[in-house]
Amino acid sequence: MKCPSCQSEVSAADKHCPNCGAQLGGENGAPEAMKAVTSTGLVLGKKAREARIKEVVDPSAIISDRAYNGTIAIVLLWGILINYLLCRFVGTAIFTINPIVLLVGYVVLAIVGIVMVAKSQNPGISFLGYNLVVIPFGLVITYMVEHYGGIGSEVVTNAFLYTLLIAVGMMACVMIAPNFFSKLGGALGAVLIGLILCEVVLMILGVRQIVTDWIAAGLFALYIGYDIYRSQQFPKTLKNAVASALDIYLDIANLFIRLLEILGHKD
């Protein structure tokens, strides 16, 4: 058998790779748990999105459409860059962190970050909250990336390319059929909650989650389109631009993780 991180030959009795130190035991458990936990970020942000629609905004805080959408793009790319740098420089060292500690740290920081983004009217505080979500999520992504061979592996490269193509495709779909995405909110939320509960049960039972990965990938693809559409319905302020970037980031990051699992299982 081969190490999922460095692809070197290892013995079935090895608990850690002799070459890179990657954890070999419990190979499926940690990624399955990470998928279910990271999906909860979208649930946590649901009420915040609803509040932003109804929010009364000081007219002086409104910025132009170009500045608003430009801020969303810059903040989103910042999050993706942070994730890339974590994958690049943390690498296999991520396996020295207990997966449970990693997940608990993500949940705690993500809750704090999402609350900061939702409650603060200061764009700087909102951006700090954004980073409190992006950095621990980036460490989770690093774990998943190294689990499937690192940045240079075929699985990771293909997952990134497919994620990029789907994100661009969903953006185009929003421009073509915005009314379709305007009706998806309640249905997407219900399916997501059901999916998380289903995955938790399957994880406890030790069932390999291939079908749910495909369902989740489709769900997060639709979420990308939905959150891009919703971003244009909020009052156009710097604070809402950061919050919208967080929504879209979570969609894209979760889609990437699911595609990693799909392509990894395929191999």
Functional labels for PLM-detected ranges:
Residues 2-267:
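A hydrophobic alpha-helical transmembrane-helix feature that marks the membrane cores
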